Swiss-Prot record:
Superkingdom in the source lineage: Bacteria
EC number(s) recorded for this UniProt protein: 3.5.4.19
Gene encoding the protein: hisI
Family (UniProt): Belongs to the PRA-CH family.
Lineage: Bacteria, Bacillati, Bacillota, Bacilli, Bacillales
Listed HAMAP family: HisI (MF_01021)
The name this protein goes by in its record: Phosphoribosyl-AMP cyclohydrolase
Pathway noted in the entry: Amino-acid biosynthesis; L-histidine biosynthesis; L-histidine from 5-phospho-alpha-D-ribose 1-diphosphate: step 3/9
Binding-site residues for Zn(2+), renumbered to this chain: 72, 88, 95
GO CC, one annotated term: cytoplasm
Subcellular location: Cytoplasm
Any one Gene Ontology BP term: L-histidine biosynthetic process
Source organism (scientific name): Bacillus cereus (strain ATCC 10987 / NRS 248)
Assembly notes: Homodimer.
UniProt-annotated binding residues for Mg(2+): 71, 73, 75
């Protein structure tokens, strides 16, 4: 089974394998998805820069892909990783560090 990229970018929720903590949300196009499978590292599509980016390529905070899950509609992805360093560009462990309720 493969993701359905016919409507464009798909959301990719990245979680830590050991803790199941949500680390970040990013978007994948088909090329990012294929590179993620090929390299076992996360690749995403930047909507602002309109280009691919490899998580941790600059910072060293890489994500080693352990598994990928596809939802029932084939239009969103869960990426299970072993995170090296913080996932957020702010230096926080997760991008979801602002508690609302």
């Amino acid at each position: 089974m493969k993701p359905n990229f016919s409507k464009g970018l798909l959301p990719a929720v990245v979680i830590e394998e050991d803790t199941k903590e949500v680390l970040m949300l990013a978007y994948m196009n088909e090329e990012a998805y294929e590179k993620t499978i090929e390299t076992k590292r996360t690749w995403f599509y930047s909507r602002s820069r309109r280009s691919l980016w490899n998580k941790g390529e600059t910072s060293g905070n890489v994500q080693h892909v352990q598994s990928l899950y596809l939802d029932c509609d084939q239009d969103s992805i869960v990426v299970v990783v072993k995170q090296v360093g913080p996932a957020c560009h702010t230096g926080e462990k997760t991008c979801f560090h602002y508690k609302i309720i």
